[in-house]
């Protein structure tokens, strides 16, 4: 239970990757941090029904962009990382270098701490395998993307990542 008159040095809104990372950095510096999350913290079940309840609510988790594309935000603990495919991509190096910012040490520290690596071949789904074969047949450079998962806990053939992994495989 929270104290009656809580005192915090920082309040972070959202527990997705951005909010969680910000809260972590502030806490590591000794600050008292409160994280506010609009969604719940129910255990992920990996079902379409649960995913729809936390991400497909118009005006809350689902938005139609002016180009008619659907933007989906996870309204749950872990934010959108709970309902997406755990793809990890580094920020554009050149953009930061133009401002004199070297991200290499921070990226190396993240890689050492987080489960970030290309998806093992045994976990490549049939559609991704078909895309890879087609790209390679055309002479294109197709590479597996880094994922933030724990491969040992992943179930081959499950493909429930987008619904919210019920096995705790994804780093969310």
What are these regions (language model features)?
Residues 102-172:
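Conserved redox-cofactor binding core of oxidoreductases
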Residues 1-99:
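N-terminal glycine-rich phosphate/pyrophosphate-binding loop and immediately adjacent elements
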């Amino acid at each position: 239970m929270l104290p009656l008159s809580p005192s915090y040095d920082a309040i972070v809104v959202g527990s997705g990757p951005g909010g969680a990372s910000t809260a972590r950095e502030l806490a590591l510096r000794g600050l008292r941090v409160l994280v506010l999350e609009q969604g719940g913290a129910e255990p992920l079940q990996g079902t379409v029904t649960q995913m729809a309840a936390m991400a497909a609510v118009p005006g809350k988790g689902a938005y139609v962009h002016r180009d008619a594309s659907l933007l989906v935000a996870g309204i749950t603990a872990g934010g959108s990382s709970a309902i997406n495919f755990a793809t990890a991509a580094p920020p554009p190096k050149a953009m930061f270098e133009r401002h004199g910012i070297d991200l290499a040490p921070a990226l190396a520290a993240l890689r050492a701490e987080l489960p970030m690596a290309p998806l093992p071949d045994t976990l490549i789904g049939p559609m991704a395998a078909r895309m890879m074969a087609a790209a390679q047949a055309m002479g294109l450079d197709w590479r597996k993307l880094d994922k933030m998962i724990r491969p040992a806990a992943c179930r081959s053939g499950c493909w429930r990542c987008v619904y919210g992994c019920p096995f705790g495989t994804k780093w969310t």
